[in-house]
Design a protein with these regions (language model features):
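Thiamine diphosphate
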Residues: 1-151
Length: 152
């Protein structure tokens, strides 16, 4: 999925990730920043960038992103998404379960709904691509895309 995501990102976009891939081998025009293993920092940086009217994509493991609820709520939802756009693309609700319990999450949908963050769960690559096009047209806000696994 991240390769599909790459083709939709523009030069003005930011892609933040938590040590998910080799940035040098990721073909995108976006400003790509590997924050490392620090999802709290990743969410705070995303909120700051979005607050300056930027479009920020976050790519990370769902379990690690969701468990940083305070940063997600305050930095991203309440601060950054008011003037910019934050799109969280997780690397699999259960797609990384083989790496341990911390890498999977099954309650991300109710958590996003509780936070009033728009939740999407595309099933196929085509649905994922159509969703990216749809979100590109939306105004400022925060959006969460749950992927079953990373198809790339």
């Amino acid at each position: 999925m991240r390769l599909r995501l790459a083709k939709y990102l523009k030069e003005s976009d930011y892609l933040l990730h938590a040590d998910m891939f080799n940035t040098n081998r990721f073909p995108t025009l976006a400003k790509t920043i590997n924050i490392g293993l620090g999802e709290s920092n990743l969410l705070n940086i995303a909120g700051g960038l979005a607050s300056q009217h930027n479009i920020v994509y976050i790519y990370g493991v769902a379990g690690f992103i969701i468990h940083r609820l305070e940063q997600l709520k305050f930095s991203c939802r309440d601060f950054g998404s008011l003037s910019g756009k934050i799109i969280i693309v997780n690397a699999g609700a259960v797609g990384y379960a083989k790496l341990g319990a911390g890498h999977s999450i099954v309650d991300d949908e109710p958590i996003m709904k509780m936070l009033n963050i728009e939740f999407y769960a595309p099933y196929t690559l085509q649905e994922f691509e159509e969703l990216l096009k749809e979100l590109e047209q939306k105004d400022s806000g925060i959006y969460y895309i749950q992927l079953g696994k990373d198809y790339d």
